[in-house]
């Protein structure tokens, strides 16, 4: 999916294509977890605790991803904040 596909109207997808897309996401996530450092789950828990001091959120509203890009690592934190 490229950037322009995101803004176009989506056609109804068959349940098979939706299942395939979800499975690809799960497989990619599992592959990423294999190379994740041991401290990443603890880091995610602590980040959630800090965010909860200021905003009421669920665990599934915070995603922490560590990407290795050559000689550097990128820690990406995505937080879905509730409406005010």
UniProtKB/Swiss-Prot annotation:
InterPro entries: MinE, MinE_sf. Pfam families: MinE. HAMAP family: MinE (MF_00262). It comes from the Bacteria. GO terms for biological process: cell division; regulation of division septum assembly. Prevents the cell division inhibition by proteins MinC and MinD at internal division sites while permitting inhibition at polar sites. This ensures cell division at the proper site by restricting the formation of a division septum at the midpoint of the long axis of the cell. Belongs to the MinE family. This is Cell division topological specificity factor.
């Amino acid at each position: 999916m490229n950037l322009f596909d995101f803004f176009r109207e989506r056609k109804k997808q068959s349940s098979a294509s939706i299942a395939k897309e979800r499975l690809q996401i799960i497989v990619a996530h599992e592959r990423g977890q294999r190379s994740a450092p041991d401290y990443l789950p603890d880091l995610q828990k602590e980040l959630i605790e800090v965010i909860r001091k200021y905003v009421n959120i669920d665990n599934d509203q915070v995603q922490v991803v560590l990407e290795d890009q050559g000689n550097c690592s990128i820690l990406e934190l995505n937080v879905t904040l509730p409406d005010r």
